[in-house]
């Protein structure tokens, strides 16, 4: 049985690529045709790739691999947080901060600081500080929650990065490749399939397309970990 059907992908608009002038020739094998100056993705190829991605991701989850979902564009931000939470993955959905992977020691210190501030807030310790000092601490807390909130349970580097927009998240791609962390990537027609281990050719701009693909990948992670793909709020990343 197919992980995702052609009808589902058509309905989600997963077949719409970018304008032909913006294409990457390396994506040619995944392109069906050009229509009105826009490349149309071959959804038969997408279905095959999605089946492979599902099996690969499920196998990785079954062997205890930890996942990081990355997607900071407006269309992906909410979906990334929801689907990552559903399968117990960590996530970045606001802005990729330089060194999130390659400077992990420093990043972990910032995450620890976030946890400390959250404890202070919940215990009332911040409220007991002088007004000005309390305001400074709350601003720091809000900033750290915005950018690092999805990483609180990531105690070490991820084993797999799941990516929504390769071009936008180029720094994440560079850092993952530098550390030999495999990438499962949604690839629009302007992307480079050579920069990921598990390609999924599809529209990475439409909310429904992003939701469909990430939803299935979250299902694969839950199935690998729990033997079922309907888990909610799966295990936290260790």
Swiss-Prot record:
CDD domains (UniProt xref): RPS2
GO MF terms held by the record: structural constituent of ribosome
Source domain of life: Bacteria
GO biological process, alphabetically ordered: translation
GO CC entries: cytosolic small ribosomal subunit
Alphabetic keyword roster: Ribonucleoprotein, Ribosomal protein
Pfam families given in the database record: Ribosomal_S2
NCBIfam families referenced in this protein's UniProt entry, alphabetically: rpsB_bact
Membership in a protein family: Belongs to the universal ribosomal protein uS2 family.
Protein name as catalogued: Small ribosomal subunit protein uS2
Organism ancestry: Bacteria, Bacillati, Cyanobacteriota, Cyanophyceae, Synechococcales
């Amino acid at each position: 049985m197919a992980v995702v059907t052609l009808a589902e992908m058509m309905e989600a608009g997963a077949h719409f690529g970018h304008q032909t002038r913006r294409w990457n020739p390396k994506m040619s094998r995944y392109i069906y045709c050009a229509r009105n100056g826009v490349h149309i993705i071959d959804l038969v190829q997408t279905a095959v790739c999605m089946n492979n991605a599902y099996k690969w991701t499920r196998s990785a989850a079954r062997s205890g691999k930890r996942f990081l979902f990355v997607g900071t564009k407006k269309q992906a931000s909410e979906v990334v947080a929801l689907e990552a939470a559903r399968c117990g993955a960590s996530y970045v959905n606001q802005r990729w901060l330089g060194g999130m992977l390659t400077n992990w020691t420093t990043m972990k210190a910032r995450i620890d600081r976030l946890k400390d501030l959250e404890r202070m807030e919940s215990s009332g310790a911040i409220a007991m500080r002088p007004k000005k000092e309390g305001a400074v601490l709350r601003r720091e807390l809000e900033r750290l929650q915005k950018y690092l909130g999805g990483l609180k349970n990531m105690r070490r580097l991820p084993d797999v990065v799941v990516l929504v927009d390769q071009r936008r998240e180029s720094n994440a791609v560079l850092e993952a490749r530098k550390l030999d962390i495999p990438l499962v990537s949604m690839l629009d027609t302007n992307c480079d399939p050579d920069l990921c281990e598990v390609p999924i050719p599809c529209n990475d701009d439409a909310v429904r397309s992003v939701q469909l693909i990430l939803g299935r990948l979250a299902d694969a992670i839950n199935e690998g970990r729990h033997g079922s793909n309907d888990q909610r709020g799966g295990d936290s990343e260790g």
